[in-house]
Amino acid sequence: MPSVRSVTCCCLLWMMFSVQLVTPGSPGTAQLSGHRTARFPRPRICNLACRAGIGHKYPFCHCRGKRDAVSSSMAV
């Protein structure tokens, strides 16, 4: 059974790639006229990544607190 951290990481990666593929104005994306493309806001991605302890892997996320060396969680 996959761990919560690996599932969270996979979900975050999937969301990031999805957002990148549907960003308006990027070349090669198919868009329906009159429809807004769905976006997943960066603050929400960063919040989830920071809580999961993997925020340091995303260059646009600036997690507050230090990594706890014993439990590998974020200390706030």
Curated annotation (Swiss-Prot):
Disulfide bonds join 46-61, 50-63. It is found in: Secreted. Coiled coil: none annotated. GO terms for molecular function: acetylcholine receptor inhibitor activity; potassium channel regulator activity; toxin activity. Keywords: Acetylcholine receptor inhibiting toxin, Amidation, Disulfide bond, Ion channel impairing toxin, Neurotoxin, Postsynaptic neurotoxin, Potassium channel impairing toxin, Secreted, Signal, Toxin, Voltage-gated potassium channel impairing toxin. The modification Arginine amide is found at residue 64. This is Alpha/kappa-conotoxin pl14a.
